[in-house]
């Protein structure tokens, strides 16, 4: 981020993050494209710090929005809580293990041992993002076509499968995590509401890990630059808090929108949007 960053830029990025992070359309693709169009370097330390704050805002939006339904589903009684918590933690563990294995495979087999930060930069390539968006769009449309209003619940095998699918999304900028996990739930016969609740329960557990990863990236970048970066971060604190608040508010609106469209059988429209946006990304590449 540079001296040209102002509250308007922060507001725009916060709104994009709040909408795209919680709708199944890939926040990373939207935020990276917006940053590039505004002339900012997505890999700059200050942009990473802002992204951490925006992620924090959307995480709290998820907690606030789903708290009431989670109380009925996850905290109904102690036995129910233990079972649901086990499913969430197991799925997250599978995501973590498979994600690390996939990253190692990509790192050593395809890119000859480059650093994890360089791999993420490579996967920010516009053509790869467009391909990931198109794949996500097709997955969402197919799951919508196969959805017949089923009323299944999360079980151990489905939790494991969803966790594995979530891991496959991690390296690919443009492949929506929520889109993939909800679609997988629908493929497995899980009800729309249960698939949505489980997907965002996973998000609340996974997001702190993402935030820590971004902070590690920030520290890594700071060590490679001068002390001027520290001064820039200090000046960014208040604008970032401003952005966090708006990503929280926008996130609440996005979740309400998502729930309504999912419940009323309009899930496929997000897939159409992903396909259209992949074309936009390719055009602007």
UniProtKB/Swiss-Prot annotation:
It is a multi-pass membrane protein. One of its GO terms (cellular component) is plasma membrane. It comes from the Bacteria. GO terms for biological process: cell wall organization; peptidoglycan biosynthetic process; regulation of cell shape; response to antibiotic. It is found in: Cell inner membrane. The keyword Cell inner membrane applies. Its EC number is 3.6.1.27. The chain crosses the membrane at residues 5-25, 47-67, 86-106, 122-142, 156-176, 198-218, 235-255, 265-285. Keywords: Antibiotic resistance, Cell inner membrane, Cell membrane, Cell shape, Cell wall biogenesis/degradation, Hydrolase, Membrane, Peptidoglycan synthesis, Transmembrane, Transmembrane helix. It holds the Pfam family BacA. It catalyses: di-trans,octa-cis-undecaprenyl diphosphate + H2O = di-trans,octa-cis-undecaprenyl phosphate + phosphate + H(+). Bacitracin is thought to be involved in the inhibition of peptidoglycan synthesis by sequestering undecaprenyl diphosphate, thereby reducing the pool of lipid carrier available. Belongs to the UppP family. Catalyzes the dephosphorylation of undecaprenyl diphosphate (UPP). Confers resistance to bacitracin. HAMAP family: Undec_diphosphatase. This is Undecaprenyl-diphosphatase 2. It comes from Acinetobacter baylyi (strain ATCC 33305 / BD413 / ADP1).
